[in-house]
From Swiss-Prot:
A matching Pfam family: Exonuc_VII_S
Alphabetized GO MF terms: exodeoxyribonuclease VII activity
Main subcellular location: cytoplasm
E.C. no: 3.1.11.6
Main EC class the enzyme belongs to: hydrolase
Catalytic function, reaction form: Exonucleolytic cleavage in either 5'- to 3'- or 3'- to 5'-direction to yield nucleoside 5'-phosphates
Species this protein is from: Magnetococcus marinus (strain ATCC BAA-1437 / JCM 17883 / MC-1)
Domain of life where this protein originates: Bacteria
Keywords: Cytoplasm, Exonuclease, Hydrolase, Nuclease
Record protein name field: Exodeoxyribonuclease 7 small subunit
Protein's job: Bidirectionally degrades single-stranded DNA into large acid-insoluble oligonucleotides, which are then degraded further into small acid-soluble oligonucleotides.
Length: 70
């Protein structure tokens, strides 16, 4: 998972899309399909965490507060 943390959001999403494509084609042997599914679920959770974090940052920036005015 440490290599996942080093990947950027875009790279993780690109890998996830590739895995989905492989699974949708239905040509992978069972064990490879299971491994791809497992990796895909990890990437999906990682991407969701990053999106949630970005949303919180945006909300924090967009929320007016009196003590942060320039």
């Amino acid at each position: 998972m440490s290599s996942d943390k080093k990947q950027g959001f875009e790279a993780s999403l690109e890998r996830l899309e590739a895995l989905v494509g492989e699974l949708e084609r239905g040509e992978l042997p069972l064990e490879e399909a299971l491994a791809a599914y497992e990796e895909g679920m990890k990437l999906a959770r990682l991407c969701q965490k990053r999106l949630d974090s970005a949303e919180k940052r945006i909300e924090k920036i967009a929320t007016p507060s009196g003590d942060e005015e320039a």
